[in-house]
From Swiss-Prot:
Protein purpose: NDH-1 shuttles electrons from NADH, via FMN and iron-sulfur (Fe-S) centers, to quinones in the respiratory chain. The immediate electron acceptor for the enzyme in this species is believed to be a menaquinone. Couples the redox reaction to proton translocation (for every two electrons transferred, four hydrogen ions are translocated across the cytoplasmic membrane), and thus conserves the redox energy in a proton gradient.
Signal peptide: none
The organism of origin for this protein: Saccharopolyspora erythraea (strain ATCC 11635 / DSM 40517 / JCM 4748 / NBRC 13426 / NCIMB 8594 / NRRL 2338)
Protein name: NADH-quinone oxidoreductase subunit K
Enzyme Commission number: 7.1.1.-
Length: 99
């Protein structure tokens, strides 16, 4: 497979994730769409690393995965806090945590 197909797939995945973030109101679905966008970026990094013949993109993709794992922990804790407070996982209720 040529790298063009991987880059097109990455752009498609990123676009699906971006539309999901902009359209959906459920915090868990928005969170999954952000993770989809991060995985699309990882695919792009690995593809460019393969094109250039270096491992720099693969190392960056590894660090993005590590940061994404930390993001999952913090994000789910925030979503659980919103749900416990408001009995809803809606993004619209996220600004109500300050009270």
């Amino acid at each position: 497979m040529t790298p063009t197909y991987y880059l097109l797939l990455s752009a498609l995945l990123f676009s699906i994730g971006a539309v999901g973030v902009l359209v959906r109101r459920n915090a868990i679905v928005v969170f999954m769409c952000v993770e989809l966008m991060l995985n699309a970026v990882n695919l792009t990094l690995v593809t460019f690393a393969r094109i250039n013949g270096s491992v720099d993109g693969q190392v960056m993709a590894f660090f993005v995965m590590v940061v994404a794992a930390a993001e999952v922990v913090v994000g789910l804790a925030i979503i659980m806090s919103i749900f416990r407070t408001r009995r809803s996982a809606s993004v619209d209720d996220a600004n109500l945590l300050k009270y």
